[in-house]
């Protein structure tokens, strides 16, 4: 088994979402001792955003790209290859202003490529990253689960499903900014959820 952990926090150390993702990965390793873990921290190793030069590179045929364009596409290729190679993905996701961190959106923009991780058929789009288990560890200061303010879960369900990753579990630690007692309770409940999911 090969596991990819993505830490999406803007903080490379001390992030609640990373703590939660670490707990998920540790539980997977406990149940799969021979598993291999690859870690990608999006704060300490930021990926370039999808801007006009990047779009130009992606839409230029490979044999016509400049050296600079080829280098830019290669950065995305590396992320795609990494995702293609793993069996399980653990995403550590904090909530920033009701959405996902820009670091995570940039990663998603990099791995979502027509003809590679999804394609269009006569019946519509089909995701090509099938057969992967995804755990999304959500850390939030307030209480947003199952409310209109939670834009993260619908978005992540949609985009991961679009890419073929439909076996997704969401793990919640909420109320982390609402006092020490609330935070302690949130982590305890999240850890119990992890133990139940990865039995």
Curated annotation (Swiss-Prot):
Cofactors (names): FMN
UniProt-listed Enzyme Commission number(s): 1.6.5.-, 1.7.1.17
Enzyme class: oxidoreductase
Pfam families: Flavodoxin_2 (PF02525)
Free-text cofactor note: Binds 1 FMN per subunit.
GO MF annotation terms: electron transfer activity; FMN binding; oxidoreductase activity, acting on NAD(P)H as acceptor; oxidoreductase activity, acting on NAD(P)H, quinone or similar compound as acceptor
Chain sites annotated for binding FMN: 9, 95-98
Keywords from the named record: Flavoprotein, FMN, NAD, Oxidoreductase
Catalyzed reactions: 2 a quinone + NADH + H(+) = 2 a 1,4-benzosemiquinone + NAD(+); N,N-dimethyl-1,4-phenylenediamine + anthranilate + 2 NAD(+) = 2-(4-dimethylaminophenyl)diazenylbenzoate + 2 NADH + 2 H(+)
Oligomer status and interactors: Homodimer.
Family: Belongs to the azoreductase type 1 family.
Classification via HAMAP family: Azoreductase_type1
Its biological purpose: Quinone reductase that provides resistance to thiol-specific stress caused by electrophilic quinones. Also exhibits azoreductase activity. Catalyzes the reductive cleavage of the azo bond in aromatic azo compounds to the corresponding amines.
Protein name: FMN-dependent NADH:quinone oxidoreductase
Protein's gene: azoR
